[in-house]
């Protein structure tokens, strides 16, 4: 968990921008052929890898990662990538931020930690969604177009 710093008054909060629904939560043992089926239905989603027993997210996986895994599989799976599960090839560098943080704080998290995915939590610490790159970038562009939001 990353602490968020001081907030610019009037700057949009993360929960106020984007949809936070461009993801699917999947189990650790999801086989890659089933990953392919999920991406066939919703190619723009990120798959968030979750362990129900631990109540913990362990990683993320994008369509781009899927292509990399099949095109250049890890040594262990060189001749049998179709038998691998998502946990074998997922990105483990994920970060969490409160959805009451502002856009600048989210951007600070991106530039310092470079996570593969940013998970959102609500005021009670529960999972509240996912902040997509597109939503963050759109919000940053809006701030650039209207700098008065930062000091409002």
Q: Regions from the language model: what does each represent?
A:
Residues 49-52, 63:
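Acidic/polar N-terminal loop/beta-strand segments that form early-domain functional surfaces
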Residues 1-22, 62-95, 102-112, 127-152:
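Tandem CBS (Bateman) regulatory domains
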Residues 25-44, 50-51, 95-115, 120-123, ...:
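The conserved cystathionine-beta-synthase
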């Amino acid at each position: 968990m990353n602490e968020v710093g001081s907030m610019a008054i009037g700057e949009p909060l993360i929960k106020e921008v984007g949809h936070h629904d461009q993801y699917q939560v999947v189990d650790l043992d999801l086989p890659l052929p089933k990953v392919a089926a999920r991406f066939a239905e919703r190619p723009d989603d990120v798959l968030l890898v979750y362990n129900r027993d631990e109540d913990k997210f362990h990683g993320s996986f994008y369509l781009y990662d899927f292509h990399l895994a099949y095109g250049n599989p890890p040594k262990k799976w060189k001749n049998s990538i179709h038998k691998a599960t998502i946990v074998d090839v997922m990105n483990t560098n994920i970060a969490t931020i409160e959805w009451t943080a502002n856009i600048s704080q989210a951007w600070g998290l991106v530039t310092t930690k470079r996570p593969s995915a940013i998970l959102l939590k609500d005021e009670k610490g529960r999972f509240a969604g996912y902040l997509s790159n597109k939503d963050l970038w759109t919000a940053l562009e809006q701030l650039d177009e209207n700098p008065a939001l930062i000091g409002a």
